[in-house]
Amino acid sequence: MGIKGLKPLLRSYGVHEYTVPLSQMSGKTIAVDGTFLLHKYKNCHSVPWHYLTLYTLSNLRLRNVKVLFIFDGMSPPEKSREKSNRRCRKQALMEKGTLVKAQLEVWKKDGGEQAPELAAVSERLVKTRGLDPSLTDPETVQVLTDYVDNMSRDTRVTSDDYELMRRSLDAFGFPYADAPDEAELCCVRVVQMGIADAPMTIDSDALACGALHGVDVVYTDLHGETLTAMSTSKSKEALGLNGEQFMDLCVMCGTDFNQRVHKLGPVTALKLIKAHGSIENIPSAAPSMSCLEAVRTREILSGGDMESRRKDYEAMVQKPVSAELIRSVFPPEFLDKLLHENWQLRDAMKRMAPEAFEKCKRK
């Protein structure tokens, strides 16, 4: 998702993601890639995605963080190949999960040697989670069962999911809009226009766009009360590039909208850009750059012209929390769970929307 191999390259130059408390953005506005957030929560295996939404929105209100949620609009045709590849990978994972789940049931019933696909999953869990290699411990078997169940689970985002997400935002008074194209690029441009203070998206396309437009920090994740951030200014400084050169490096790495040059990785791409200044200046004796579609890919990664929509985005203001909508959108068990998990959220939500929680169980 995003620029291929960019973050490992940056890490090799000492540029790492770092964390900041969410409270640091109190009173400020974040332009959030709502599509990224929804996909992230749908792929969470341990907690229902709609509860994660409730928790996050409550936390944002508690910390007095203003948010503009922006969802993907019409993707450019150049992204069709990447979208098709993602669908195929998702379908293949679900099919493998279904197969391994059936093999697990046979193994739990009959014992003996595991089928090859199940054995590969078991071996991976033994290495990554420190499970008992004998796989005889009940807790170990349960971990394996849960993992296999998640492999076969359909985590594709539906139109109903988007509708529920938007209703959830309405309940908490957060404004939202559809981007003219890619949400992550729109988030950066909204910041560049001075309408928001920082963008948030996991998609590294935003780093290319931010580096070009002078947006110094891109938040790449939100986990509880902590934001993860990446500095575009430090990234450019560490690599010795300006914004236009950083953009060309990203184009050469390969993106969701183009293919990189065969057998030309990020390290070589950086050397070529530093030596010649731009893709167009790379000598013809070097590998052909035609597959990069550099002009069009730069145009996409730069983000669309947002000035025509300035008034629409400036009119996106935060509204009060609606207790009535919260009760209609979130099931009672989610509201009860929220109140009893975090005393700060409990006190804050009872102040902002006491009627929404009046029927929750008391402890």
Curated annotation (Swiss-Prot):
Determine if Hydrolase is one of this entry's keywords. Answer: yes
Query: Main localisation, per the record?
Result: host cell
Its GO CC terms are:
host cell nucleus
Name the InterPro entries on file. Answer: 5-3_exonuclease_C_sf, HhH2, PIN-like_dom_sf, XPG-I_dom, XPG/Rad2, XPG_DNA_repair_N
Output the Pfam families linked to this UniProt entry: XPG_I, XPG_N
Highest taxon of source: Viruses
Q: How is the cofactor bound?
A: Binds 2 magnesium ions per subunit.
UniProt keywords (A-Z) are: Endonuclease, Host nucleus, Hydrolase, Magnesium, Metal-binding, Nuclease
Molecular function terms from GO:
5'-3' exonuclease activity; 5'-flap endonuclease activity; DNA binding; metal ion binding
Report if keyword Transferase is assigned: no
Q: Give the matching Gene3D superfamilies.
A: 5' to 3' exonuclease, C-terminal subdomain, 5'-nuclease
Localized where? Host nucleus
Q: Which cofactor(s) does the record list?
A: Mg(2+)
Q: What is its EC number?
A: 3.1.-.-
Q: What does this protein do?
A: Probable endonuclease.
- Give the UniProt family note: Belongs to the XPG/RAD2 endonuclease family.
| Protein known as | Putative RAD2-like endonuclease 095R
What species was this sequence derived from?
Answer: Frog virus 3 (isolate Goorha) (FV-3)
